[in-house]
């Protein structure tokens, strides 16, 4: 019997709160690049372990650090003077039953491939130096297969949190960044780099979006063209946000620009990310497991990306909580808002947490007696099927930042 608790949440629903703040760091933000590399390295190791040994061996690659380089951007195209440095650290199994695997090679290859696929104007070979300092360990397949068929044991006493549904402001912030970094948008507007941050503020029924967007200098010939691209970004963000809300909207882009000065100062880059000059990055310093930073909502400080997907509850429980929450609001009639908290106990099976709690706000006309059993059933089903979280992670089907 699992310890599942369902209780009412005595809190003003998010849409009725007077002030709401939401942030998303886009895929080209240095912190997000760190998250993306960490997760891609973990996924590459998982698949390499499965191919070679038939099982995922222990590893954690969640300690990626980016040290910014130096660049000289200018209209029409500048240059990278000093490449950014990317340090891969953590721990991984490099030898199983006397058979070695190229852990460093796999990690470096995965990191570079991630950069090529996601930072389109970055020359990975000349503008980034990737160094692997992942600690090497050895493993025994007999121990791994002896545990097969049983739930993994929690590696820590930790917790995960999630909530659903997204508010209007949360959806707008997420969709705005997703639009600006979509392949379709990049084809139409190559001057828009990947280092994008969207900050949303809702004051009652007034939503203000502040967008920071690194422009790629080679696609912008002068100040006039830069301002044209800024206007496109503003208009497209306004357009997609308008489809998601009837509230009043205002959109600002690159508010630190100084265009009227004798020597204009604007946000242009050589590569599309501020990591090329002055902006460092670290895993876990940006978006939470659901892709947003939401001070109005419950959040865990745990970094999700790069942690092993087998028994690292700091990763699994945060992702599981969000899956649970989404299923509850979708399938349980009468639930207006739900917060999920799951707590592990070190050394105990991860499918039997110390406590799994759902706090719910109901629609008018519904009672806790009507929803408690259904909510508990959704949570129990997800805990029973917890290996599916691992499977989705290995296949790259779950976003971790």
UniProtKB/Swiss-Prot annotation:
It comes from the Archaea. This is S-adenosylmethionine synthase. Keywords: ATP-binding, Magnesium, Nucleotide-binding, One-carbon metabolism, Transferase. One of its GO terms (biological process) is S-adenosylmethionine biosynthetic process. It is an enzyme of class 2 (transferase). The keyword Magnesium applies. It catalyses: L-methionine + ATP + H2O = S-adenosyl-L-methionine + phosphate + diphosphate. It comes from Methanothermobacter thermautotrophicus (strain ATCC 29096 / DSM 1053 / JCM 10044 / NBRC 100330 / Delta H) (Methanobacterium thermoautotrophicum).
């Amino acid at each position: 019997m699992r310890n599942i608790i369902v209780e009412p949440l005595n809190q003003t629903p998010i849409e009725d709160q007077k002030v709401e703040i939401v942030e998303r760091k886009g895929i080209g933000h240095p912190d997000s690049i760190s998250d993306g590399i960490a997760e891609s390295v973990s996924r590459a190791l998982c698949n390499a372990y499965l191919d070679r040994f038939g099982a995922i061996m222990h590893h954690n690659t969640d300690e990626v650090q980016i040290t910014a380089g130096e660049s000289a951007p200018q209209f029409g195209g500048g240059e990278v003077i000093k490449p950014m440095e990317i340090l891969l650290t953590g721990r991984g199994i490099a030898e199983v039953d006397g058979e070695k695997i190229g852990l460093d090679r796999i990690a470096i290859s995965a990191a570079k491939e991630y950069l090529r696929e996601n930072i389109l104007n970055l020359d990975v070979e000349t503008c980034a130096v990737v160094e692997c300092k992942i600690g090497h360990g050895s493993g025994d397949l007999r121990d791994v297969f002896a545990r097969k068929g049983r739930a993994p044991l929690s590696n820590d006493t930790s917790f995960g949190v999630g909530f659903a549904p997204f508010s209007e402001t949360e959806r707008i912030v997420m969709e705005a960044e997703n639009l600006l970094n979509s392949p379709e948008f990049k084809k139409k507007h190559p001057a828009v780099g990947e280092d994008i941050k969207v900050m949303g503020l809702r004051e009652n029924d007034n939503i203000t979006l502040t967008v920071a967007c690194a422009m790629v200098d080679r696609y912008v010939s002068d100040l006039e063209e830069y301002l044209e691209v800024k206007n496109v970004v503003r208009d497209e963000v306004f357009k997609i946000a308008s489809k998601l809300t009837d509230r009043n909207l205002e959109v600002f882009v690159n508010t630190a620009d100084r265009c009227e000065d004798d020597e204009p100062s604007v946000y242009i880059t050589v590569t599309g990310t501020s990591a090329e000059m002055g902006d460092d990055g670290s895993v876990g310093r940006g978006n939470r497991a659901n892709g947003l930073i939401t001070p109005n909502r419950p959040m865990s400080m745990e970094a999700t990306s790069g942690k092993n997907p087998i028994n690292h509850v700091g990763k699994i429980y945060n992702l599981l909580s969000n899956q649970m929450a989404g299923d509850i609001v979708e399938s349980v009639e009468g639930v207006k808002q739900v917060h999920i908290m799951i707590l592990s106990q070190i050394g105990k099976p991860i499918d039997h947490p110390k406590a799994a709690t759902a706090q719910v706000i109901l629609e008018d006309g519904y009672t806790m007696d009507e929803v408690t059993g259904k909510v508990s059933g959704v949570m129990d089903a997800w805990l029973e099927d917890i290996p599916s979280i691992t499977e989705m992670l290995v296949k790259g089907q779950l976003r971790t930042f």
